[in-house]
Amino acid sequence: DFISRLESIDSESLSNREKVTHGMLEFALSSNKDSLMDRSWEFGAGVSGFTGFLIDYNQQMFVPDSESADMLLKRLELYKRLFTQIADVQMIGLKNNRVATERNLLRTIDQLENYLGASLEEDPLLLVNFSPEISESFISDWKEKAKKIIDLNIRPTVLAYLEQLKSDHIPKGRSDEHSGIMWIDGGEETYLRALRKYTGHKNITVKEVHEVGLS
């Protein structure tokens, strides 16, 4: 549906900036179609979960100027909606027998508890790399604004997501004996798409791949 909607757009009517966005979307959708069909976000947890948004990503960012810093604050404001949406889609996945393994759920829970257990002053979302050209007073003011967003919007939403994982997902988490993707609804199709992606053969079957491995 997204691809057909994108194709229906008259690119000649777009501005140069919009054409760049259109091209990027076209590439992203065409190259990641199978991944989008997998809907892995419905059961992502552990290393394939979403805790990186809280723990890692901001530490990799470089803020060159005050305008970029202000845009980053706006990005942080969207985290409330992000984690609300994550909780919602994973609840949909749960209702459709698409749930993470218990092992990965416990990893996510541990990561979220550690995040929420850290003081506001030590929140990883504050660990941004600012340009030396940005004044210390500006950085201090930026961090105070960020802490308000984190305290009022992000942490309560993350806590709600954590409680959902504990109460709803853990009781239905897949055991180690059922850790493979084949054990979730739609898992066989997901596995076949992965085979096509990584082998380059459109019509390959699971049996054929296993026979290659045994030969």
Regions of interest found by a model, annotated:
Residues D1-S215:
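N-terminal maturation segment of proteins
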